[in-house]
Amino acid sequence: AYVGPKADIGNSAVAKGCEVLGEVKNSVLSYNTQVGEGAVVSYSVLMPGAVVESGAVVQYAIVGENCRIGRDAQVGAPPETAQDPDDWGVAVLGPGTVIGDGEIVPAKTLLDRHHGEVKA
């Protein structure tokens, strides 16, 4: 794994082949994942090949294989942001899902690679 000089990793598992330039807390990064400069990944799991671009925030999420999360995008949210506990849940991105720059994926959302919301 390559950990950049501005990276901040705490209480996380980082596999071989990862590149971490941002902040990773309480998370698991599978092999060949990338976390860009200024990006934050917390309480999340990134599957192999997932990319979190600069400035993006991923919280309480499961990010599938080969997903790409664009610059300054947001995926998931902490539980305390929900007014009703039933309205909160982990955000899940299926394999190959691409989230555009600045896009927001709310908590308790399940998306597939075609960006269709999957109803549980």
Residue ranges of model-derived segments:
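Left-handed beta-helix
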Residues: 1-120
